């Protein structure tokens, strides 16, 4: 097993409920600090990679956010390489989407505790909790980022470029990223599932059963569908807001399930 994926976490309970969500959690977790000061949005894939590296360097390897950040960094580096190699039919679309997408993560990562987007709260609250494996943190971060942030990023990108989700090669280019994510997801699952102790440890077996219920590609397929819905709702402020509220709540629920300590 990857040493970074086998490290255990410690936690200092504060015995405080999240404001406005009494009874949802028995306690809140004392979380390591993120980036020390708010940073401006990045404007290129190269800047995004550098920012991801900075965030990772400032976190303990066992921090739940670091577990996700490592996986995201690897995927972003691969996407950047493919953009440079002309792998995508519309590199401008993919570059803008990649930058818009990653900035949503950066905003969540540096948000004050009371301002963390709902979809990201499970990971941010439980990133130092005991009994949760690194694979759970990595997939919970992917859940928040893909299920909630990706539809928003697609619509924002299309708006900025004066196009629509169904135009040109957008969907085909979007789907080309799936191969990279397949490799990243397979790698993290294999590093966990190939552990010799897995067959003997009921805890690890339970975690394995839990994380196999969620896959990145299924989440991305749904994210594209939700982007199409958001695109149609872009001129209806009320309907769009209600849809986004429901999306955030559903994403948060899935995140809490993925982060179940077993």
Question: Where does each model-flagged region fall?
Answer:
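Short, intrinsically disordered low-complexity segments enriched in Ser/Thr with adjacent Pro
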Residues: 4-7
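Extended, well-folded catalytic/binding cores that form a central cleft or groove in large enzyme
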Residues: 10, 14-16
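Long acidic/polar interaction regions in large eukaryotic complex-forming proteins
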Residues: 73-165
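Leu/Val/Ala/Ile-rich N-terminal alpha-helices, chiefly Sec-type signal peptides and the beginnings
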Residues: 18-99, 103, 108
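A cross-kingdom marker for long, charged
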Residues: 210-262
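Short helix-loop boundary/capping segments
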Residues: 151-207
